[in-house]
Amino acid sequence: MSAIAPGLVLLAYLCGSISSAILVCRLAGLPDPRDSGSGNPGATNVLRIGGKGAAVAVLIFDVLKGMLPVWGAWALGLTPFWLGLVAIAACVGHIWPVFFHFRGGKGVATAFGAIAPIGLDLTGVMAGTWLLTILLSGYSSLGAIVSALIAPFYVWWFKPQYTFPVSMLSCLILLRHHDNIQRLWRRQESKIWTRMKKKKAPEQK
């Protein structure tokens, strides 16, 4: 177990470092998401620059690269401490990917995937919080921020032994959203629906 656990942490980081947003955009002939739209290689930005199909592919891949390493670690009987490190490593890989010059995304979908193996009840309330916030506000970033803030409390209620690692994940996500938080405070953040409409407008002319 002593050799398996660190190996899984490293594997999780390498899995997280596979940037699906960049790869999907390359395969679809789309601009590099790091240099287009919001500049973030994630599903929301791919939705803006490439449409729903590409965005769904990125979202699924990003969730799975967080979920599968944690699920594997759980199946091998790793303790909550090591499960937490595996989850954090997957998100760190997504945020600072070794394969893409350490220019990655914000880790929201990957963190959601990493938390999912804890339980369907937790997964459901997390997804509901994220979706409801976006539907009510129109801000994708606010959905991520609210979910990250409330996630440790949800985990403490459902599976308290995972509260600390999930809190670390939340801190990572909040740190990656510091620019979004400032724009939201200044009321300068763009709503996801507004950006999609702007993209469609030239196509309709």
Swiss-Prot record:
GO terms for molecular function: acyl-phosphate glycerol-3-phosphate acyltransferase activity. Pfam families: G3P_acyltransf. Belongs to the PlsY family. It is a multi-pass membrane protein. The chain crosses the membrane at residues 4-24, 80-100, 107-127, 130-150, 155-175. Pathway: Lipid metabolism; phospholipid metabolism. InterPro entries: G3P_acylTferase_PlsY. Its EC number is 2.3.1.275. GO terms for cellular component: plasma membrane. Catalyzes the transfer of an acyl group from acyl-phosphate (acyl-PO(4)) to glycerol-3-phosphate (G3P) to form lysophosphatidic acid (LPA). This enzyme utilizes acyl-phosphate as fatty acyl donor, but not acyl-CoA or acyl-ACP. GO terms for biological process: phospholipid biosynthetic process. It is found in: Cell inner membrane. SMART domains: G3P_acyltransf. It catalyses: an acyl phosphate + sn-glycerol 3-phosphate = a 1-acyl-sn-glycero-3-phosphate + phosphate. This is Glycerol-3-phosphate acyltransferase. Probably interacts with PlsX. It comes from Klebsiella pneumoniae (strain 342). It comes from the Bacteria.
